[in-house]
Amino acid sequence: MEADLLIYNIKKIYTPLGNCPQCGSDMENIEEIEDAYIAIKDGKILAAGKSPAAISAKEKIDAKGMIAIPGFVDPHTHLIHYGSRENEVALKLKGYCYVDILKQGGGILSTVNATRNASDDQLIEKAMKSLDIMLSHGTTTVEVKSGYGLSTEEEIRLLRLMNKLNSISLVDIVPTFLGAHSIPTEFKENSWGYVDKIINEMIPKVKEENLAEFCDVFCEDGAFDYEQSKKILEEAKKYGMKLKIHADELTQSGGGELAGILGAVSADHLEEVSEKGIELMKKAGTVGVLLPGVSYFLDRPYANARKLIEKGLAVALGTDYNPGTSPTENLQLIMSFAYIKMKMSAKEILTAVTLNAACAIDRGNEIGTIEKGKKADILLIDVPNLDYVMYHFGINHVNTVIKSKGDKAVVIGVR
């Protein structure tokens, strides 16, 4: 066996296995291989296991007793935007809720204005900085939503920029159309008029140019109600798009139930999800993407991860990186929040940010585990054990990132 790259002297590999989301107690099923190696060829994992006596490779990396885990997958971000919203924090400290700020023209709409006024180069430069931060902290694949354009022209522009970013960044980008992020100012008194615009103009144009794999809707009070969300997602499904839903974040909006009924790939947030929503999601195989960074930043209750897992749901974790409710690119910090605030175990968390996160963007057959045939997206982390990643919070534990791009594996030394 000859490899392009051999990583040897690995203290232990921790990885989930398979291509499908791990549900309930199966999230604890982590393969542990001591004194291990990983061989890579043409950007994919050729073999991984107990270190053999000898293996030939063009390039070798001595892991020096570090731990190897799959590259992190962030299944929920709003990467492409301009400006920031630190001015809103003072309002939140005074007791204003997110919906209050949204109704005053703040929140999403203020970022929409800043993004519309930014040039392509400005948006690319800002996004690339964030992608570099993500990669250095171990995120190798990221889902990116539009939603700060809220017009046909601007939404298409943002989706085109995602494709450009995917071609120039080492991080793999999975695009999601989120024209239904908020009602734009020009449709403030005619929300159904905007829904019609999404259905009759935006979705056909997105599909015509093949710009997005997923369609998402913010199903929430102050954004799109249940019937509006249902209509948009049903239309997207007719066009062959896979579905996602911002579900039950601030109120019990029925988003989880809608996700199950329509067979969405994921339902995200779920702080207020109903019992019926959980059952319908479970039957449909919908992944629940939890976003504890939002709960931290908004000082709101966290999603009940333990309940969702014990009910047999597949749970993933994401940053929800955005300028208003979760301004962080650091998935390791999110993992620590899940560990302490949502009572998830280290093994559940690893599954949630690798295989289950990959399945939440329909990439479980390509990434999310360290197995033969998967992309060589691998992290070497300088920690004594898996729990230590979450326990010693607020710092970057990643030493080296191995990132598959095309038919090559690129080695990035973080520190």
From Swiss-Prot:
Needed cofactors? Zn(2+); Fe(3+)
> For this UniProt entry, which segments traverse the membrane?
none
Chain residues that bind N-formimidoyl-L-glutamate? Y148, N322, G324
Catalytic activities? 4-imidazolone-5-propanoate + H2O = N-formimidoyl-L-glutamate
Coiled coil residues, start to end = none
Is this entry keyworded Hydrolase? yes
E.C. number, please?
Answer: 3.5.2.7
So which domain of life are we looking at? Bacteria
Q: Which is a Pfam family this sequence falls into? A: Amidohydro_1
An example Gene Ontology CC term for this record: cytoplasm
Q: Which residues bind Fe(3+)?
A: H76, H78, H246, D320
Keyword flag Transferase: no
An example of a Gene Ontology BP annotation on this entry?
L-histidine catabolic process to glutamate and formamide
Per UniProt, the cofactor note for this protein states: Binds 1 zinc or iron ion per subunit.
Name the enzyme group at the top EC level. hydrolase
Q: In which pathway does it act?
A: Amino-acid degradation; L-histidine degradation into L-glutamate; N-formimidoyl-L-glutamate from L-histidine: step 3/3
Q: Which GO terms describe its molecular function?
A: imidazolonepropionase activity; iron ion binding; zinc ion binding
Supply the alphabetized keyword list: Cytoplasm, Histidine metabolism, Hydrolase, Iron, Metal-binding, Zinc
- Write out the similarity annotation: Belongs to the metallo-dependent hydrolases superfamily. HutI family.
Task: State the name under which the record lists this protein.
Answer: Imidazolonepropionase
Query: Gene encoding it?
Result: hutI
